[in-house]
Amino acid sequence: MKKYVDVILPLPLPKYFTYSLPDECAEEVEIGCRVIVPFGRKKFYTAIVRNVHYCAPTEYEVKDISALLDASPILLSTQFKFWEWLADYYLCTQGDVYKAALPSGLKLESETIVEYNPDFEADAPLSEREQRILDLLSVDSQQCVTKLEKESGMKNILTVIKSLLDREAIFVKEELRRTYKPKTEARVRLAGSADEKRLHILFDILSRAPKQLALLMKYVECSGILGRETPKEVSKKELLQRAGVSPSILNGLVEKKIFEIYFHEVGRLNQEVKEVVELNALNEFQQRAHDEIVQSFQEKNVCLLHGVTSSGKTEVYIHLIEETIRQGKQVLYLLPEIALTTQITERLQRVFGSRLGIYHSKFPDAERVEIWRKQLGEKGYDIILGVRSSVFLPFRDLGLVIVDEEHENTYKQQDPAPRYHARNAAIVLAAMYGAKTLLGTATPSIETWQNARNGKYGFVQLKERYKEIQLPEIIPVDIKELHRKRRMVGQFSPLLIQYMKEALEQKEQVILFQNRRGFAPMIECRTCGWVPKCKNCDVSLTYHKGINQLTCHYCGYTYQLPKSCPACEGTELVNRGFGTEKIEDDIKVLFPEAAVARMDLDTTRTRAAYEKIIADFEQGKTDILIGTQMVSKGLDFDHVSIVGILNADTMLNYPDFRSYERAFQLMAQVAGRAGRKNKRGRVVLQTKSIDHPIIHQVIGNNYEEMVDGQLAERQMFHYPPYYRLVYVYLKNHNEALLDQMAAVMADKLRTVFGNRVLGPDKPPVARIQTLFIKKIVLKIEQNAPMGRARELLQRIQKEMLEDERYKSLVVYYDVDPM
């Protein structure tokens, strides 16, 4: 009897598609395996098998699958359940979830672009088909799969591509900016035997070459070669630094056959783990918090740990992790920002060693695929540390989920679908496994705070800072008055300059916070007021001095800064506003001797860049760190005594009902970076709104007063946590047609939802990538059945798209928008 499979395609399709199984693989296919399938006229995709059955569909002609890619499933049953929940709750398709969930190396398709890996060395003979593909790529190193299929004359080419990808002979489009070459480190060892007698002979030989002798002696010291059975491995970089000699001295010893240099792989998955240490004992306050969390988990599945900045929440997490993995269960530890993984990784590896796996988008795709496959086996990592995409990984027996800095809006995926919130998704995922979830932060989101206070979540507080470090002193500075008196130096108040100077003189560090990247948010012609706008989007372009270009932060469009105004030919083009790049420039003028680094999206596009900025600041190589909100997110530095918040008003004046909450969180978090064990930190908060209630609440660290004020307003105006929000976005290239379609859809929604519907209106940015945008807001009572609301929304969307006039309408939803 003929077998069929229902598959999920990596496309926004509302249903599964059915394919027939050829007899040769009919018994091998399992739910969760990948298959290559034809779709459309000439395209092939990697699909995931959802069901295996014997029922042929009647509405379309069934095609055979082209190939089976897996001998065993790459998706577990709980993951399918999780995908279904995400698609249903966030009003998207399982195809959308599939595209977001899997590393690109696991979802090849006809349009995938592949590139030859120049570092590839075959460890086994290539098949004739594999060699043919590599021959074609050696002529043109970047080609799409469709073109390779045409030129090679092969059928089922995706199986060959998969094989070459597994062998790392090629890499796929998403990874073209990264290298697959394993990260290696040059190390030094003695050539030949290393006994005491030979060392004495070498010392005699080098007696007339003092620098070479000093290098050899330093190697003996670093490696511990005389006191150990197995000498410690010594890196070339460390040896040269500690001996204080140039590479030519080492090269001389290599030529004399005394030393040899070899390369050791230090990639993430093969990273040499230092000796594992015992857990640190918790102090009295941490222990009490730990015990209260454990007690809370007896009754509730979710617990909020509200701990002030620098209270030692991570140490509490580590003890809970250790107890969970001792029970044979796995832990998922979520962070809002890739930058944070660098610091936390070191702390966790010291305790858990190779039981820890790290997963995020800055890793090459091959490494992410490797972690995914490892998690499917019996010997998966006990702990996964990662950012929001880590919720998609397979787990055999998840016991605990930790969501650190749970209030951060970076946990929310903005584009494309699924527009999920990783914190909320993680809570649901944990429930599916019967696991517990711990939410940790110094400044909880108002929704989480409300859930904790009304008893839905457990609630534990940790009010004392670790080792009695004092909370910083926050000093507000009225820059409106200083600007009026012309006492500002660029963007810096005299007080901030004085404090920075004192800190640098005392060898302390400074963090400056400005939540806008680039050099200037806007360029303006002083003569006629012309402002350069993006040709694709309804926004002004940001000037980036480093590349001397104007850039759109929405679509990436760039063009050179004109020498004169194209409207009036005036030559006075002036900067309006300031970003991190401008601050960096100004600081280098004010403090030319200081080592300055900038941490924003432009300077941290690679994993290595993140790590270097953080490591240099930790080691005291950087004196002043300038950054966007990245610097506010839980990073711990011992020598920061001054934090400058350069312009609080940009946060307070943002047109969003959450702006006051976010402003408080950002300012409180960045302020928490200041302070040392024996010295109280200082925060200079520059603002033109010196009497604003939020400014006073930040100064007094009065979180609860801020929350009470915001809750009263939100209840009055029907916002979360009292109401749920769904934003309905409509897009089209034709603005007039879009206006008409948006009005019709809003009317249809009002017939069902009544006055819960607001709009349609233009969002703050009303055109992106040549598409005009309209937004309809839906406010639904917290206790209303959301499942029914979702059904009605999808029914109305279907009605719209079935109307011939509205075929070109693009509709998508943002559920629980941030």
Q: Where do the PLM segments sit?
A:
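Inter-lobe coupling/hinge segments of SF2-like helicase ATPases
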Residues: V277-N283, Q287-H290, E299-D739, D747, ...
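Accessory, non-ATPase domains that flank or precede helicase/AAA+ motor cores in DNA-metabolism machines
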Residues: M1-I384, S390-T441, R453-I469, V752, ...
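Short secondary-structure junctions
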Residues: F591-A594, L749-V757, E802-K807
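A carboxyl-terminal module marker
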Residues: D747, T751-F772, V811
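Short amphipathic alpha-helical segments
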Residues: K15, S235, R724-V726, F772-K774
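Glycine-centered secondary-structure boundary/capping sites
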Residues: L91, P103, G153, E168, ...
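Solvent-exposed, membrane-proximal periplasmic/extracellular interface segments of envelope transport
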Residues: F39, A56-V62, S66-S72, G644, ...
